């Protein structure tokens, strides 16, 4: 496993119980290896790649599913997981809310963080905004946006953006958000000149000290969103009435009159 996959494994083992019913969207071999290494048994891996052989994911289940338009009913799985794939969607926010919809307990996302350091590396030309290499490595036929031949824009997230997206999609309860951070960049493998590699080598010490004090400036983070227990975490201006959630008018009257 590489650095990113080790971080992925750490996040799964830390946040998801081994007997959970898990759906992985836009999944692949890395997801299979992580969940298999952790001895999970109830996992469904999905993707839209026509080349995938479902037998390669045994003993897990494999289904053809679009992350932006899942066919599952609400709350079909305990947790829904995505690893390094939301940025391949034409609408990452739609995929995120679809994950939320079909999860009963919560969602786990491992993606690139839109940090100051990453923005600086993009401007300096050390990190790309479009994934041309992914398409090249897939014979210029797959690996881009929606797994097409068109290279995707690398959509990077922030904590605030995740929280705004979830709270906008489901504004009825108090969600819980948890984060872990890591760095998966090996600057020695960057396609840059030897001089630039030497310069970056000396900056490594400074960078390590910097992220010690500012861990959120690393390029990678995992996001756990736990759905609210509406019997306890419903917003105070709402109430249950005849099996549905309604506005508690008395709350607004008391607040504004």
Q: What feature does the model see in each segment?
A:
Residues 146, 150-180:
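Short alpha-helix
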Residues 81:
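A conserved beta-strand element that flanks and buttresses the S-adenosyl-L-methionine
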Residues 23-69:
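Class I SAM-dependent methyltransferase SAM/SAH-binding core
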Residues 173-257:
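A C-terminal cap/extension of S-adenosyl-L-methionine-dependent methyltransferases
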Residues 93-107:
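A short glycine-rich, Lys/Arg-flanked "PGG" loop and its adjoining helix->strand segment in the class I
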Residues 1-20, 30-34:
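Conserved alpha-helix/loop element of class I SAM-dependent methyltransferases that forms part
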């Amino acid at each position: 496993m590489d650095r990113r996959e080790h971080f992925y494994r750490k996040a799964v083992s830390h946040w998801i119980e081994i007997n959970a019913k898990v759906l992985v969207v836009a999944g692949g071999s890395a997801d299979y290896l992580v969940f298999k290494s952790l001895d999970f048994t109830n996992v469904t891996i999905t993707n839209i790649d026509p080349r995938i052989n479902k037998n390669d994911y045994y003993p897990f289940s494999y289904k053809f599913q679009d992350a932006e338009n899942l066919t599952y009913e609400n709350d079909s799985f305990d947790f829904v997981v995505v690893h390094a794939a939301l940025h391949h969607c034409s609408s990452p926010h739609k995929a995120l809310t679809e994950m939320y919809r079909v999860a009963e307990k919560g969602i786990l996302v491992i993606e690139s963080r839109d940090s100051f350091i990453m923005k600086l590396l993009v401007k300096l030309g050390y990190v790309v905004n479009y994934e041309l290499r992914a398409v090249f490595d897939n014979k210029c036929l797959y690996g881009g946006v929606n797994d097409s031949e068109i290279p995707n824009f690398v959509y990077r997230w922030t904590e605030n953006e995740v929280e705004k997206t979830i709270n906008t999609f489901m504004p009825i309860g108090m969600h819980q958000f948890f984060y872990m951070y890591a760095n998966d960049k090996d600057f020695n493998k960057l396609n840059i000149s030897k001089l630039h590699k030497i310069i970056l080598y000396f900056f490594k010490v400074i960078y390590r000290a910097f992220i010690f004090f500012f861990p959120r400036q690393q390029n990678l983070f995992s996001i756990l969103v736990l759905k609210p227990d509406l019997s306890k975490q419903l917003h105070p201006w709402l109430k249950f009435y005849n099996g549905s959630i309604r506005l508690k008018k008395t709350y607004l009257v008391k607040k504004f009159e």
